[in-house]
């Protein structure tokens, strides 16, 4: 229901000619339900008018019952690419430790990689539905999340931020 409710809020925002940002947060378990697909399909309302709405997919591979179906398989495939993310972090760390030019080279490679990733990799399902895909984002890195949300706020049309999280890594008292 989060995406449906957010879509309603976004339409109301636009009718009232306001410019606030509407954000829906949905878990990977809930995304495999029919109501979520219906809402994703209806986002065409925002696509046509280039109106913004952000969806944050909290992907922790956890739900009350086992996830089944195409969306579950699709998300599992994306998660399995985590080894790629670890490799990427190791390369970035190595580059950042090169005196003088390392940080500049790392930044340039990261920008290039992000551009290529946005074009070809995991979010093609969402892209095919007209929803811009931004991910994979470390859901435990507040600065990475803030950066992703700020980029998403500048986007015209619906955008999904795919945040990978792990149970037990949340708020500590």
How would you describe each model-predicted region?
Residues 60-173:
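Long, well-ordered, tryptophan-enriched scaffold segments
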Residues 1-58:
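Thiamine diphosphate
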């Amino acid at each position: 229901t989060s995406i449906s409710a957010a879509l309603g809020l976004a339409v109301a925002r636009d009718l009232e000619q306001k410019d606030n940002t509407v954000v829906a947060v949905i878990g990977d378990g809930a995304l495999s339900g029919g109501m979520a697909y219906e809402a994703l399909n209806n986002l065409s309302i925002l696509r046509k008018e280039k109106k913004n709405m952000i969806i944050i997919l909290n992907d922790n591979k956890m739900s009350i019952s086992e996830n089944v179906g195409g969306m579950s398989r699709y998300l599992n495939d994306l998660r399995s690419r985590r080894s790629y993310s670890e490799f990427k972090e190791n390369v970035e760390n190595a580059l950042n430790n090169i005196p003088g030019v390392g940080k500049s080279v790392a930044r340039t490679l990261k920008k290039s990689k992000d551009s290529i990733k946005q074009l070809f990799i995991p979010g093609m399902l969402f892209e095919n539905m007209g929803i811009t895909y931004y991910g994979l984002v470390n859901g435990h890195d507040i600065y990475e999340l803030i950066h992703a949300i700020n980029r998403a706020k500048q986007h015209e049309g619906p955008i999904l931020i795919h945040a990978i999280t792990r149970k037990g890594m949340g708020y500590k008292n």
